Amino acid sequence: MHIEQITPELTWRLRRDVLYPNQKIFEMEMDEDAGGIHFGAFKDDKLAGVVSLFQKETDFQFRKLAVDPSVQKMGIGNSLLNYITDYARENNATRIWCNARFTAIGFYLKAGFIQTGNLFSKNGYDYEIMEKFVWTADLADFLISLNR
């Protein structure tokens, strides 16, 4: 399996198939797509997972994480999360966050995200904002030194 940057259009089919199966492919395009960075996980040269990442200063929001059901539970979602977390960290992020569907909260908790208590519903789905603070090695070393 490998992960690489892809065009927004390549995310749409998996977004639809996994997250919104009753919608049309063209409905998967987000206005924000042009301003985001999109990543695909490929297994056996087939697109198996996608995620879109959006930066606002030192905050990075990821959206529409989707893994093909035929390869779920194989670590692809975790690999995508680790990849975008590293990407965000390398680009001076302090926080990475998402609007997590209630059905995915356990997945994000296992990946080190925390629940914020900010809940909302949209398009028939219930969400909670979840976040993870990421630090560069220099900042982490500095914070550790404060506790010595």
Regions found by a protein language model. Give the residues of each.
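Conserved catalytic-core motifs of GNAT/GCN5-like acyltransferases
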Residues: N99, I114-K132
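Conserved active-site tyrosine of GNAT-family acetyltransferases
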Residues: R15, Y108, F113
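Conserved GNAT acetyl-CoA-binding A-motif
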Residues: A88-R101
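Conserved short alpha-helix immediately C-terminal to the canonical SAM/SAH-binding motif I
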Residues: L80, A104-F107
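Conserved beta-strand in the GNAT
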Residues: G40, K46-F54, Q61-A66
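A conserved beta-turn-beta hairpin within the catalytic core of GNAT-like acetyltransferases
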Residues: Q55-L65, Q72, K122-Y127
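Short amphipathic alpha-helix that is part of the acyltransferase structural core
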Residues: M1-K43, V134, D141-R148
